[in-house]
């Protein structure tokens, strides 16, 4: 699994994401990137081969991950402000207890958010209706800091 990040550099998140994905695909396979297709629920994928990917972008950066199995990535800038009322909508009861005990509620909610988004991207199901059904931990090792972003990467086992 390989994760890479780059500044948007005046490009849209979509443009920068496709550029980074194309570069990473070329470096991994030595071949031009095949067409990107989209599943029914919106998950992009390559129609051929065994390379899986996920892309996310923030205001300043785009991040991409390549893997041999389905994968999802999400990122938020460390300084991003977030409406704390979102906690009521996305956190399970156990997560809510962790959130309430956290010294920095904004950062705790961002940690849960990026992890839930990465899980949703990996599964291809999106966040439609189930974010509170998943019980996660604030200390989940899949959450990292990369280039000033809080990043979560989830891959199928």
Language-model features: locations:
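Core catalytic alpha/beta fold that binds nucleotide/phospho-ligands
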Residues: 1-157
């Amino acid at each position: 699994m390989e994760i890479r990040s780059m500044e948007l550099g005046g490009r849209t998140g979509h443009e920068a994401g496709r550029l980074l994905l194309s570069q990473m695909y070329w470096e991994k396979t030595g071949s031009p990137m095949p067409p990107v297709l989209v599943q029914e629920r919106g998950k992009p994928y390559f129609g051929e081969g065994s390379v899986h990917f996920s892309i996310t972008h923030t205001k300043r950066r785009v991040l991409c991950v390549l893997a041999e199995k389905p994968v999802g990535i999400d990122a938020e800038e460390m300084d991003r402000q977030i409406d704390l009322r979102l906690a009521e909508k996305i956190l399970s009861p156990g997560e809510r207890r962790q959130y309430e005990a956290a010294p920095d509620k904004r950062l705790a909610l961002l940690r849960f958010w990026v992890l839930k988004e990465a899980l949703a991207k990996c599964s291809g199901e999106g966040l439609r209706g189930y974010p509170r059904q998943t019980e996660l931990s604030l200390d989940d090792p899949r959450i990292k800091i990369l280039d000033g972003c809080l990043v979560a990467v989830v891959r199928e086992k």
